[in-house]
């Protein structure tokens, strides 16, 4: 089957890899000169299924009001003048209750756990290197309340069969030795030993090279003008004067998927702006070993080989990609506070990207009302975590194979009134 994939970020490339391995003739189209040039370029670098959770959570509306008056707030809102943004925020607000939070988190953990298994299998099969580490991740608490609230997430982890360790402050240095110097600032942490880290751009670039060798065609520097349709099928992709045709099409344009699908499929995917710093290592014994997630500021600090990646924050401001100095100062403040000897912060590279986010936090992966159009977008801040599993899922569905995990509630149809999953829903996913 000829499959055309729109987008060469980690989702487009992962989809291309798995589809090519399934025997399909795959073409990838992207306006950029190479893979992973946008959202996949400099994300936080964590592969953390256990921390998979929607931003729409109990208490977030009140916190959002408080954050409006804080200098180092993890969330900021700026009206972009569109009714779509207002509708999206209203939908997000409706998901900020315990029932929706647990349901959405369950979906996210299921896909994320499966995705990590797929990544491991890919790594074992191909030997792909991407400065990855399998040292687990550590969520840090600065208040007693944060430590107590961890029990809510632990319930979901236990239901999903995810190993964890709840650590008091004095034990944090057992897994991250450099934290011994700042343990007095912390109340404890939640460690997930099975989580991983890695450079998403490096992974995507190398997987794209492997896919190219396997026969995948990459059409870079190619802007897509429109999807053409005839009846209930997509007829081609218009790129300037050229029309590229296939038997099946996969939309993996990230935040730009919504506009490209306008008039065809309505998806509630909105850009969530995030920032990162990439910092050269200064002192080895003062740097993190794996990934730290500071709950107070929702900022991740990740160790690559000789670099530290500091990423986080969320701005609901549309497609504005301006690099704001106050956001850089927040990232610098957190990494200096936790790892004062770790990196040469003054030499850091500052970056921003737009994560494609749904109001319920769960990505949109699966079929549409068009018989040959599939979606792989909306993964928000967990794109790297969910990439391989989503690519394998798309490949299975297009190939007519039964996926290894329940998938009906990941498709766009879940936003339709009266939607009921066709398969029993549970959290165990890849553990079945």
UniProtKB/Swiss-Prot annotation:
Its cofactor is FAD. Gene3D superfamilies: D-Amino Acid Oxidase, subunit A, domain 2, FAD/NAD(P)-binding domain. Induction: By alanine; slightly repressed by glucose. Is activated by the Ntr system, mediated by the nitrogen assimilation control protein (NAC). GO terms for molecular function: D-amino-acid dehydrogenase activity. Transmembrane segments: none annotated. Pathway: Amino-acid degradation; D-alanine degradation; NH(3) and pyruvate from D-alanine: step 1/1. One of its GO terms (cellular component) is plasma membrane. One of its GO terms (biological process) is D-alanine catabolic process. Pfam families: DAO. FAD binds at residues 3-17. Keywords: FAD, Flavoprotein, Oxidoreductase. Its EC number is 1.4.99.-. It is an enzyme of class 1 (oxidoreductase). It catalyses: a D-alpha-amino acid + A + H2O = a 2-oxocarboxylate + AH2 + NH4(+). Disruption phenotype: Cells lacking this gene fail to use alanine as a carbon or nitrogen source and become sensitive to the presence of the amino acid in glucose-ammonium minimal medium. They exhibit a glutamate auxotrophy when ammonium is the sole source of nitrogen. Catalyzes the oxidative deamination of D-amino acids. Participates in the utilization of alanine as the sole source of carbon and nitrogen for growth. HAMAP family: DadA. PANTHER family: D-AMINO ACID DEHYDROGENASE, SARCOSINE DEHYDROGENASE-RELATED. Belongs to the DadA oxidoreductase family. This is D-amino acid dehydrogenase. It comes from Klebsiella aerogenes. The gene is dadA.
């Amino acid at each position: 089957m000829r499959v055309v994939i729109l987008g060469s970020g980690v989702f487009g490339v992962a989809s291309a890899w798995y589809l090519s391995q399934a025997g399909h003739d795959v073409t990838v189209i992207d306006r950029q000169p190479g893979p992973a040039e946008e959202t996949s370029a400099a994300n936080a670098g964590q592969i953390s299924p256990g921390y998979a959770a929607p931003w729409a959570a109990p208490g977030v509306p009140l916190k959002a009001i408080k954050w409006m008056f804080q200098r180092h707030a993890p969330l900021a809102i700026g009206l972009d003048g569109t009714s779509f943004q207002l509708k999206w925020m209203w939908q997000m607000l409706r998901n900020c209750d315990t029932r929706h939070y647990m349901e959405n988190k369950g979906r996210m953990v299921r896909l994320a756990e499966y995705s990590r298994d797929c990544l491991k299998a890919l790594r074992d099969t191909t030997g792909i290197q991407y400065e990855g580490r399998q040292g687990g991740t550590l969520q840090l608490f600065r208040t007693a309340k944060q430590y107590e609230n961890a029990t809510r997430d632990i319930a979901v982890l236990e239901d999903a069969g995810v190993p964890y360790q709840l650590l008091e402050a004095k034990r944090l240095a057992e897994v991250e030795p450099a934290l011994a110097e700042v343990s007095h600032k912390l109340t404890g942490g939640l460690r997930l030993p099975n989580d991983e880290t890695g450079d998403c751009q490096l992974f995507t670039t190398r997987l794209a090279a492997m896919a190219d060798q396997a026969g995948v065609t990459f059409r870079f520097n190619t802007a897509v003008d429109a999807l053409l349709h005839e009846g209930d099928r997509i007829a081609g992709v218009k790129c300037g004067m050229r029309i590229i045709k296939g038997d099946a099409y996969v939309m993996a344009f990230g935040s730009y998927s919504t506009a490209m699908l306008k008039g065809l499929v309505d998806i509630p995917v909105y850009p969530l702006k995030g920032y990162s710093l990439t910092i050269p290592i200064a002192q080895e014994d003062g740097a993190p070993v794996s990934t730290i997630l500071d709950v107070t500021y929702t900022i991740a600090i990740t160790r690559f080989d000789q670099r530290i990646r500091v990423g986080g924050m969320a701005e609901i401001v549309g497609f504005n990609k301006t690099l704001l100095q106050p956001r850089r100062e927040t990232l610098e403040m957190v990494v200096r506070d936790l790892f004062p000897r770790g990196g040469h912060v003054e030499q850091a590279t500052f970056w921003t990207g737009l994560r494609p986010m749904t109001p319920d936090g769960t990505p949109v992966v699966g079929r549409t009302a068009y018989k040959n159009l599939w979606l792989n977008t909306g993964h928000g801040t967990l794109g790297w975590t969910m990439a391989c599993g989503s690519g394998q899922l798309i490949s299975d569905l297009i190939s007519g194979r039964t996926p290894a995990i329940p998938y009906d509630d990941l498709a766009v149809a879940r936003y339709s009134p009266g939607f009921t999953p066709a398969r029993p829903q549970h959290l165990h996913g890849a553990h079945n």
